[in-house]
């Protein structure tokens, strides 16, 4: 049976977002939401017919909120809003981000507080399910009043305007609708505002980044475990007794992950008089990785709330009361997404340091730069440079966006969140850190092969090593390889969900204890 996810505004999960955004799973509006949506719309119709003054329905927008709009102009007002607010810059957002945006906006609207017609929500849903993906520039949002510019670009194709992708081809909005067999719509009172006023873009990008960060945390534990086996790491820093007396959840989970990955390994050791303890990048993996786990668990808890929230303005209450408030403001997510970037940056930073330990012959006791006949061959020399470059770039990107604000709209919107910038930066940091962790896994596998043909790895690390070596070759000499290709293969291998799934079938990995 084909899977379909019901959208009720209450129960959407981050896993659902991934399924719809990346796997093309279909979705539908839950029957339980229909009554609330219709009731909310009736209230808006009454407002227009009664000529009541309500922001964004019978008034202008932003600092123009005191300009009254006649009932006969309320429809034109909404289309004008979309045409002028679609003012983004930069490259288009990737398909998974656009699909996540469409999904989260629909899920917010079906809660029944936005005064939008059911048919209009269904039109956006039809675009999503039929694979019409609006062209949305990545830049241009202040994260308050919501993500106005990018969401306006999302709406344009619904009106037969703008641009959209359909089956991989960039078309005019109308062409995309025609090829998909979708009719365009006209907006009714308040609908333009309901579609674009909210934290949807920053939340969608941040949700994808958060999900990927959780996978990266597990991969970083695996990378650290492999590096420990290269260095014959001392096992006592991972004993449960050490961590129960400082019961930070992420720290406890990391120590357990390492123990699980190393089960049965012949490449670890115990402390001796000649070797009392390992360096921080090995010994303190639970404390370093664990701190990032706790941070990202917090971010996920905020994402779980936001993807099921109403971030519109004004809000149409079920009793007919209309509230002009600030739920569109991105600050509640801007700070967590800055935190997300910092947490991921630390993972890349410590992984790069372990790459350095692997390629440094004085620290690894292996040939310089993990290649036979160093000098004639340079091996992993510049690979470590590249990781250092990414780690340093992350440190710049990790500067918080949410500490900045520029007043806008004639100082009516005088404090903004920059939350969309925070989410986008977090995703860039994630991509950089993913490359670094992939390189650590590749370097650790190379080092293990240089040490011995009989690895006797742990239960989890052996599964990872065997899978990795099916795709990524041992580097014998510089002459016969282009290391760039092998690095790309390494990233592709660990990006494939089946890689981590196979490891987790062998051993349990978690981010919280």
UniProtKB/Swiss-Prot annotation:
Pathway: Amino-acid degradation; L-histidine degradation into L-glutamate; N-formimidoyl-L-glutamate from L-histidine: step 1/3. There is a cross-link at residues 144-146 (5-imidazolinone (Ala-Gly)). CDD domains: PAL-HAL (cd00332). It is an enzyme of class 4 (lyase). Contains an active site 4-methylidene-imidazol-5-one (MIO), which is formed autocatalytically by cyclization and dehydration of residues Ala-Ser-Gly. It catalyses: L-histidine = trans-urocanate + NH4(+). HAMAP family: His_ammonia_lyase. PANTHER family: HISTIDINE AMMONIA-LYASE. This is Histidine ammonia-lyase. It comes from Streptococcus pyogenes serotype M3 (strain ATCC BAA-595 / MGAS315).
């Amino acid at each position: 049976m084909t899977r379909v996810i019901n959208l009720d505004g209450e129960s959407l999960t981050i896993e659902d977002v991934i399924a719809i955004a990346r796997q093309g799973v279909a979705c539908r509006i839950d029957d339980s939401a229909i009554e609330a949506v219709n009731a909310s719309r009736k209230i808006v119709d009454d407002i227009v017919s009664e000529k009541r003054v309500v922001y964004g329905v019978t008034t202008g927008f932003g600092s123009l909120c005191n300009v009254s709009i006649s009932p006969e102009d309320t429809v034109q007002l909404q289309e004008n809003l979309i045409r002028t607010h679609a003012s983004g810059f930069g490259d288009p957002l990737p398909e998974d981000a656009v699909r996540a945006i469409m999904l989260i906006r629909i899920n917010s609207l079906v809660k029944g507080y936005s005064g939008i017609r059911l048919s209009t929500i269904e039109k956006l849903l039809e675009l999503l399910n039929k694979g019409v993906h609006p062209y949305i520039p990545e830049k241009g949002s202040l994260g308050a009043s919501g993500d106005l510019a990018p969401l306006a670009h999302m709406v344009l194709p619904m009106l037969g305007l703008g641009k959209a992708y359909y089956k991989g081809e960039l078309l005019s909005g109308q062409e995309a609708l025609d090829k998909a067999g979708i009719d365009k719509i006209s907006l009714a009172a308040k609908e333009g505002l309901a579609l674009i006023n909210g934290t949807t873009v920053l939340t969608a990008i941040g949700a994808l980044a958060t999900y990927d960060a959780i996978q990266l945390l597990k991969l970083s534990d695996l990378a650290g475990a492999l590096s420990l086996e290269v260095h014959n790491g001392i096992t006592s820093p991972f004993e449960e007794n050490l961590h129960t007396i400082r019961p930070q959840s992420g720290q406890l989970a990391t120590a357990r992950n390492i123990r699980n990955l190393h089960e049965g390994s012949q490449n670890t050791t115990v402390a001796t008089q000649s070797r009392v303890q390992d360096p921080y990048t090995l010994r303190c993996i639970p404390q370093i990785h664990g701190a990032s786990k706790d941070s990202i668990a917090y971010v996920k808890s905020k994402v779980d709330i936001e993807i099921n929230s109403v971030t519109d303005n004004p809000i149409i209450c079920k009793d007919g009361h209309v509230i002009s408030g600030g739920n569109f403001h991105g600050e509640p997510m801007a700070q967590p997404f800055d935190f997300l970037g910092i947490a991921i940056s630390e993972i890349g930073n410590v992984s790069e340091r372990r790459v350095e330990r692997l390629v440094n012959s004085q620290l690894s006791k292996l040939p310089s730069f993990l290649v036979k006949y160093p000098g004639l061959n340079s091996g992993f020399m510049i690979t470590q440079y590249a990781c250092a470059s990414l780690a340093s770039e992350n440190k710049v990107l990790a500067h918080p966006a949410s500490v900045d604000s520029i007043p806008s709209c004639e100082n009516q919107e005088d404090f903004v969140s920059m939350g969309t910038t925070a989410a986008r930066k977090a995703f860039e940091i994630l991509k950089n850190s993913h490359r670094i962790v992939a390189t650590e896994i590749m370097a650790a596998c190379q080092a293990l092969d240089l040490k011995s043909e009989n690895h006797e790895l742990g239960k989890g690390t052996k599964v990872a090593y065997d899978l990795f070596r099916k795709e990524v070759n041992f580097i014998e000499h510089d002459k016969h390889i282009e290391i760039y290709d092998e690095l790309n293969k390494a990233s592709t291998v660990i990006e494939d969900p089946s890689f981590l799934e196979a490891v987790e079938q062998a051993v349990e990995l978690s981010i919280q204890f």
